[in-house]
Amino acid sequence: MTVTFQNNPVSISGSFPKVGDRLPSFTLCGADLNDLNNEDFKGKKIVMSIFPSIDTPVCSKSVKVLQNALMTRSDTVLLCVSADLPFAMSRFCTEHAVANVTNASFFREPAFTERFGVNLNEGALRGLAARAVIVADEFGVITHSELVNEITNEPDYDRILMSL
């Protein structure tokens, strides 16, 4: 499977989850440096926004757009996942007044990108995650899955929100 980065093909590996699948198990590092996993979000809908780095324009914009769109939804968690260290993600949220977001890093668990089918195998971003959004209901069943074809593009916000 491939995506593009600045219109150049980049191969990705792993199996990208599909609508109707159960959300794959994961263990990520939270902002407080403690582990986060599926059980921490039991009974909540999850919008998992996966991206290369919070310090890129499209990644930061998508976090802000989703945070604003989900601000009033107490039944939904916005889980932002990248290779960024938790310190960088916390800094971003403080500097940009982003709240109600759960930041998580796969820096301790690089196999996350394979398990979720977003591992960039080549090019300048090799080892980071492709841009994707996966929405799961309160039972852990996927209701939306989008692997963004061009890494520098934003996800389809309308489809994300309609899937909740």
Curated annotation (Swiss-Prot):
Domain Thioredoxin: 17-164
Positions of the catalytic residues: C59 (cysteine sulfenic acid (-soh) intermediate)
Gene3D superfamilies with a match to the protein in the record: Glutaredoxin
Claim: Zinc is one of the keywords in the record: no
Any one GO molecular-function label of the UniProt entry: thioredoxin peroxidase activity
Enzyme type, top EC level: oxidoreductase
The UniProt record lists the keyword Disulfide bond: yes
Disulfide bridge positions per record: C59-C93
Catalytic activity, EC: 1.11.1.24
Similarity-based family: Belongs to the peroxiredoxin family. Tpx subfamily.
HAMAP family: Tpx (MF_00269)
Note: The active site is a conserved redox-active cysteine residue, the peroxidatic cysteine (C(P)), which makes the nucleophilic attack on the peroxide substrate. The peroxide oxidizes the C(P)-SH to cysteine sulfenic acid (C(P)-SOH), which then reacts with another cysteine residue, the resolving cysteine (C(R)), to form a disulfide bridge. The disulfide is subsequently reduced by an appropriate electron donor to complete the catalytic cycle. In this atypical 2-Cys peroxiredoxin, C(R) is present in the same subunit to form an intramolecular disulfide.
Function: Thiol-specific peroxidase that catalyzes the reduction of hydrogen peroxide and organic hydroperoxides to water and alcohols, respectively. Plays a role in cell protection against oxidative stress by detoxifying peroxides.
Complex formation: Homodimer.
Name of the protein in its database record: Thiol peroxidase
Organism: Vibrio cholerae serotype O1 (strain ATCC 39541 / Classical Ogawa 395 / O395)
Name of the encoding gene: tpx
